[in-house]
């Protein structure tokens, strides 16, 4: 997370917890019209997977947080608040979240190059809390990644195991699309997995 994202999480986490949710992390993105503040909330880990975040939950958190931000004013200027459930391809923001998703496949973007690259994809082998490292298995090799050097990290779901793999288009369908002069969509059924996003 950016410094601004960390500041906002520290401010809002207690408020979100009072509403019965965990604030996983925040994204603060500057855009021409001002800024976008994205908050990712989830059900407390002990209550998963029996309970899931609903759109109504996102709406309620959005209302409460918006009113709170109006009072505290941690952001100057115009901004748009978005509250979302993490989804299957969730972002990972903390070492604790990496540890919780042990043995999951992740994509990691780095601030500075490590192991010859700024982009890595591998399974989470372990988390070294003391040193602040995430150990990934990349192409059969264990690589220790400095957590402070991680810009973004996201779970890579096994769509096939979830029964959400994209269906192959038949030649007839492909030809029909071409004749209609329409660009084929890359969106798979997996992209339609439930994710509540409230603005």
Curated annotation (Swiss-Prot):
Gene3D superfamilies: RimP-like superfamily, N-terminal
Chief location: cytoplasm
Keyword set, alphabetical order: Cytoplasm, Ribosome biogenesis
Record-level GO BP terms: ribosomal small subunit assembly; translation
Keyword Transferase: no
GTP-binding as UniProt keyword: no
Positions with biased composition (Polar residues): 177-189
Residue stretches in coiled coil: none
Signal peptide interval: none
Compartments reported by the entry: Cytoplasm
GO CC terms in record: cytosol
Region (Disordered): 170-199
Entry similarity comment: Belongs to the RimP family.
Function as written in the Swiss-Prot or TrEMBL entry: Required for maturation of 30S ribosomal subunits.
NCBIfam families, per the entry: PRK00092.2-3 (NF000931)
Name assigned to this protein: Ribosome maturation factor RimP
Organism: Xylella fastidiosa (strain M12)
């Amino acid at each position: 997370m950016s410094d601004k994202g960390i500041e906002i999480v520290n401010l809002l986490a207690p408020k979100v917890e009072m509403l019965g949710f965990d604030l996983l992390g925040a994204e603060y993105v500057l855009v021409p019209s001002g800024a976008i503040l994205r908050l990712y909330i989830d059900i407390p880990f002990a209550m998963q997977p029996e309970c899931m975040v609903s759109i109504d939950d996102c709406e309620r958190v959005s209302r409460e947080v918006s009113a709170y931000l109006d009072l505290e004013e941690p952001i100057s200027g115009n901004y748009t608040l978005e509250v979302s459930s993490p989804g299957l391809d969730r972002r990972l923001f903390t070492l604790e979240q990496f540890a919780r998703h042990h043995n999951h496949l992740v994509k990691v973007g780095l601030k500075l190059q490590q192991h010859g690259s700024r982009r890595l994809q591998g399974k989470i082998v372990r988390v070294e809390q003391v040193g602040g490292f995430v150990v990934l298995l990349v192409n059969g090799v264990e690589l220790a990644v400095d957590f402070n050097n991680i810009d973004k990290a996201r779970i890579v779901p096994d769509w096939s195991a979830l029964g959400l793999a994209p269906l192959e288009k038949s030649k007839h369908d492909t030809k029909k699309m071409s004749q209609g002069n329409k660009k084929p969509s890359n969106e798979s059924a997996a992209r339609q997995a439930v994710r509540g996003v409230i603005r």
